[in-house]
Amino acid sequence: MVEDHARGVEDDEDLGVLARARLAAAVDRGECDFALDVASRIPMITICDLLGVPSQDQEYMLSLTKSAISSDDQPEYSAAADSARNDILQYFLGMVEERRATPQEDVVSALAGSTIDGEFLSEDEIVLNCYSLILGGDATARLTMIDSVHSFSTNPDQWAAFKRGDVSVKQATEEVLRWASPTMHFGRTAVQDTEIHGTPIKAGDVVTVWNGSGNRDERVFADPDRFLIDRSPNKHIAFGHGPHYCIGAYLARLEISEVLLALRDFTTGFEIAGPVRRIYSNLLTGISSLPVRFEPVSAEVEELVL
């Protein structure tokens, strides 16, 4: 259901237009905080549009999702995280009630009208699905976009190869996902007794999968600690693996690739222009502030500035 709606974004070319317009405006200014001015906007606008969150509420929703699972400036636990999570749940509870009364062409309406074995999904089931979608639909793509600019800035040879067209945007997207690995870990419950590298695991034990470690596994990746955009094969686990593979992987890849294409088309290069700050989180890793100075390809940018 969600993937069908995501593919509709691609068909309408809305996402490409959004990414190019946001990047063009930033490049035209010459400098921006890429994390705040570009990467924070594209995934959130996209997932909010899919869910049916109106434009006037999207800035509010961005502030909630960022507070719910990470913090830009507080290393200690904050009650704001609990409050943000509760506010997200309450917001979608209100949306579910509205959509059941007046369905629209969005994911919340689709969930509200869905049945399993003839029974409609409960409000709790719909709200928790929306909660997962809004958080997952923002964080991975946003943090990977930010990391891609940082990684290209610190690996100019890789940027040059991408700018020349030596490497496809598809390959580059997979490598920035592997390199960024924004979701640090997943928990999995063993369904039977087993063993992992000599450690006995009993049925019912919870095993933590560390994505960053897996994506640097020297048995899988040659030169795992190098950012190489022509890496092939690239069997990373940025979106997890198996039955719990990220449902939003298709959309995240599309968002990241559109930003990379816009960077290639609108800039000859870019550099870090100030202190880089990282987020505080037990679940995610990434950058919260990335000041960037662009070298524009002027003619193309001027035509697309908002």
Q: What would you call each of these model-derived segments?
A:
Residues M1-L306:
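Cytochrome P450
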